[in-house]
């Protein structure tokens, strides 16, 4: 699989994605700074997200969950308001892409609706599909038809979900990177008990031609080392400059020191 100028294979050096996501805290200058830090730390790509709060979360649905909320229960704002704050203005994309080109790092994003896919297409060489969309067949087809490499996260999916998603993507596109993922964002040490890296063995047997990867939300790099030994070559970790900042992703993110 080729992303930009990098060919990724079982025998190539690993490909590292610094997921800046919401860690810019709504400030494009912080985003620029994090791009620079990610490059200095050795990341191959800096990743963002394109979504609108009203199309990615149900305000009423999350409010009705109350105490059943998982990692969102620790957020100081409501789920809807947090996503509203984390959504990037469309006009940022060109500027972020330009900054990535300037420092020599791949610009990447996860689009979460059809309009966002079309918006991102002019800026990206590959698409990342988040775990939450693995059963949304229409968006999988839409992205696959763009004929660019696809990184598919499989958190919270069962094996039938994964098989269906791979079958859907491959109808139009054989450039698929299959990524194990844990979807708990609490930064709790208990998350290491649910990372299930052994599923990479299953993926390798089912799809020996696929590049494997890990989209990870645990802190540190223990899971990266384990996944590498099981065949993963693409790694995505959240990235920040300060783990003590207020926000949903800072606590479990890598920083420039731990990334190196």
Model-predicted segments: where are they?
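Catalytic cores and adjacent flexible loops of soluble metabolic enzymes
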Residues: 1-260
């Amino acid at each position: 699989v080729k992303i930009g100028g990098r060919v990724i294979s079982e025998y190539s050096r690993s490909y590292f994605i610094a997921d800046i996501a919401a860690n810019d805290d709504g400030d494009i200058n912080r985003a620029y700074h994090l791009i620079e830090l990610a490059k200095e730390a050795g990341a191959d790509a800096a990743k963002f997200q394109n979504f609108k709060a009203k199309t990615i979360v149900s305000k009423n649905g999350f409010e009705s969950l109350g105490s059943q909320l998982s990692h969102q229960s620790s957020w100081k704002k409501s789920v809807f308001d947090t996503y509203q704050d984390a959504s990037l203005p469309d006009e940022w994309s060109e500027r972020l892409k330009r900054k990535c080109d300037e420092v020599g790092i791949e610009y990447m994003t996860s689009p979460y609706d059809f309009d966002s896919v079309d918006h991102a297409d002019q800026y990206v060489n590959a698409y990342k599909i988040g775990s939450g969309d693995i059963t949304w067949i229409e968006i999988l087809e839409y992205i696959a038809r763009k004929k660019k490499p696809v990184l598919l996260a499989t958190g919270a999916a069962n094996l039938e979900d994964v098989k269906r998603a791979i079958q859907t993507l491959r109808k139009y596109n054989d450039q698929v990177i299959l990524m194990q993922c844990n979807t708990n964002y609490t930064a709790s040490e208990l998350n290491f008990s649910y990372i299930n890296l052994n599923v990479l063995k299953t993926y390798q047997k089912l799809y020996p031609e696929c590049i494997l990867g890990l989209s990870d939300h645990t802190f540190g790099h223990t899971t990266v080392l384990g996944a590498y030994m099981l065949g993963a070559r693409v790694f995505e970790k959240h990235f920040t400059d300060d783990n003590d900042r207020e926000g949903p992703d800072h606590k479990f993110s890598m920083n420039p020191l731990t990334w190196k």
